[in-house]
């Protein structure tokens, strides 16, 4: 009894997982280059970018249309 997860949900999860890994690391090293090896500033900005990615994921998750999924569940219950 595996749950059927829509492919759009998996695609969003994979995208934001990659963004959570790549974006803060990229930001850290760019800031290291720009601010002449100041690890405190680079780390702080990288942490901020990780939070931006997380907030973006939450916003996308809340705005996702789930009404079609609920309709499919009701239809399958009627068929039984």
Curated annotation (Swiss-Prot):
The chain crosses the membrane at residues 15-35, 40-60. One of its GO terms (biological process) is vacuolar proton-transporting V-type ATPase complex assembly. Keywords: Cytoplasmic vesicle, Endoplasmic reticulum, Membrane, Transmembrane, Transmembrane helix. InterPro entries: Vma21 (IPR019013). It is a multi-pass membrane protein. GO terms for cellular component: endoplasmic reticulum membrane; endoplasmic reticulum-Golgi intermediate compartment membrane; ER to Golgi transport vesicle membrane. Required for the assembly of the V0 complex of the vacuolar ATPase (V-ATPase) in the endoplasmic reticulum. This is Vacuolar ATPase assembly integral membrane protein VMA21. It comes from Scheffersomyces stipitis (strain ATCC 58785 / CBS 6054 / NBRC 10063 / NRRL Y-11545). The lineage of its organism: Eukaryota, Fungi, Dikarya, Ascomycota, Saccharomycotina.
